[in-house]
C-alpha cells in the first residue's frame, strides 16, 4: 500500500478535532507543561518562519502530552495594527473584515499542518472581550500611578500618522513602514516601566541558563543601569546674565575623572539652550542645526557622527575653579541624567572624538603608557590635586563623598530605559479607556462601561486619526461630574495586547466572560514553561511582557515574577542565502509543500535541516529527501508484526541484531535529551534514520516490531499523522506513552582494545567483555608478538575497557 499523505493527514486531523485531543485537562493536580510559540499577526498567509516556530513548539507539546503531562498549547492572533488600515486604504475593505477573513484562512492553514493547538482557548486581541479586560488593566494601572499623561517629544511617523516607541524606530525609520521618523511634541499616555527598571534588571539573573545570553545582554543594555555622581556647576557671571540661569546639574559615572573635564555637553532640549534660543542669542546657522538635531530620534543621535556648537557661555569647575565651556551636542539625550554631561576626552572615546573634531583641550588624569583615550577604570590618578596617586575606584568614592559633604552633589542611580509611550493616532487598535472633561480633567471610564469599542462607520484615508474625525463616537458624559465630555481618541500601541496574552491563555476559557484572569488556573499554568519566538523581539515584546507580569502581580492578578521560564529564539528561514520575501521572489508557500508532499514532510524537513536556534536554508532536494524517508518508513511498517510486543531476550540476539537494537535504544535515549533540553531535533531524526538502516540488515520479526514500537513513539511529535496511522495499525497506539530504557541493551558483549608498545599503537583486537585482566594481557601479547620478539617486558598496563600498554626494553 503506497503512502498517501493527504488521506492520512485529513483522517487524523478530523479524529483529533472530534475528540478534542489537544484540549488541556481540568485536573489541576496533574504535572503541567505550558508550551507557547509567539502568536502571529494575521497578515493573510502563514510563511515558513511561522511553520518553523510552530513546528518546534508542537513537537514539544506533543511529546509532553504523550508522556502524561497536562499540556496547554494555545494559539491566537495579534490582530490589531497598522497593516489592517493600510489594507483598508489599498483594497477598499474595512480593517475588521480584512483582519477576520485573514484569521479564518490562517486557522485553516495552521491546522492543516497538524499543530496540536487548543481550539477552545483561541483568541484574537481585537475581540471585544479581550479589549474589555485590557482596558480594565489600563484603568487599574492608571489608578496605581503606573500610567500617566505628559507632553513630550515623541517619535512621529508621518506616513502612518502615529507615535512610535523608541524600540520601534530602526535606523531612524519606522519599524512597520520604513518611513523616516521625526521628533514631535505631543501629549500622550505613558506606562511607567521605569518603576520596575531595577527589578527587571535584577530578575535577569533568574533567567540565566534558561534564556539565550544574547537576549539577556540586549535587555541588560537596554535597561542601562549606571551609578554615578550628580552635581551642580555654577555659571560665570556673564553666562548667568545670558541664560537667566545660575547653575546646571551634571551626571557622571566617572567621578574619578572630574579633574579631566574640558567641556560640558548639553542636549539641544536643555533649558539653558532653549533660553539662549528664545533670546535669539545664537546665530541662524546654529539655530537651524539645533532644530535638525531635535528632529532626530534618540537612536539616530547616538549613532550618527558627533556634532556640536559652542554656546559662548561657561561654567565654573566645582573643585578647581576653572572655567569650562558649554557646548550643545547631538549625542546628549535630554531624558538621560540631567541632559548635561561632563566631557573628559582623555578617558572617553566619544568625548575624545568630539574634542579632536573641535580642537578642545584633552586633560589626562589617569596614569597610563597607552595612547589616549585611556578608558579603563583602573590606574592611579594624576593632575587631580589631593586625589593624586589614588586608585580610580578609591578616588571615585572619595570624590563623591567630598561632593556630598559640600552639599554640591549626590550619589545617584540612572537608567537608560525610558517610560513607554502607548498612545497611537490610528483607528485599528484598542481604544484608550479615558475621558477628557473640561471640569474634571482626565477621568477613567467606569469598569461597567467596558469594553469601549470602535465605531465601524469610519473612513480610513491614511490621514490623521479616524476616531478624532468621527461625528459622534467621541461624545460622552463624564462619569465624575455628569457633564458633557469626550472619549480619548488615541488607541493603544499593539505591544500592549501582546504583553499579557499568555496569561489570558492560561485562564480557564469557561471564565473568560466574567473575569480577565482566573486566579486558580493562572496560578497552575503560569509561568510559560517554554516560549518560542524570534530574537527580534528581545527588547520589544519580551521586555514589555516581563513588565506586565510584574505589574499584574502587584495589582493582584498574577503571582509569578516572570512570564516565561525558558526561551528559545529560533533562526530565520532563508532561501538562496536571503530571508524569504516577496520582493526577492524567494518565498516558498507552505500550502504548496503540503499539497505536494504532505504536512509531515514539511515538519520533518523543518526540524531536520538545522538546529532550531540556527538559520535554516531552504533546500528543495532536502524536502524531497524528507518525503522519501517517510515513504520508506511507511513501506517498511507494512511488514511489521501487528499486536502485542513479543518479548526479546538480549542473549538470544546475534551481533547484527544487538547492534540494531542498540541503535534503536540510543535513539530513544537521545529523545529524552532532545525533548527535555537541547531541542536538537536534527540529531534525533538522524539517530532514528541510523537505527532503521541498521535494522534493515536484520531478519528478526520480534526485533523489528520492538524497533517500530519505539521509533514511532520517538517520531510522533515530529511527523504525527503518519506515526498515528502506523501505530494504530500495528499497536492500537499503545506505544504512545513514556518508554523506558533497557540497560541490558547498552551492555557490550565484546571489547575493542588497542595495544601500544612504549606508547606507540601496534595492534587492535576484540575480546569478550567478561575476559579477565590476565586473559586480556595474554591476548595483547599474542597480537603483538613480532614487536616483542627478543625484548623483555618491563611493565604491563591495562586501562579498563580501553587499551593495553606494554613497556619493553
Curated annotation (Swiss-Prot):
Any Gene Ontology biological process: leucyl-tRNA aminoacylation
GO CC, one annotated term: cytosol
A single MF term (Gene Ontology): aminoacyl-tRNA deacylase activity
SUPFAM superfamilies in UniProt: Anticodon-binding domain of a subclass of class I aminoacyl-tRNA synthetases, Nucleotidylyl transferase, ValRS/IleRS/LeuRS editing domain
Disulfide bonds: none
Placement of sequence motif 'HIGH' region: 40-50
Residue numbers binding ATP: 582
EC category: ligase
Compartments reported by the entry: Cytoplasm
The name this protein goes by in its record: Leucine--tRNA ligase
Source organism of the structure: Campylobacter jejuni subsp. jejuni serotype O:23/36 (strain 81-176)
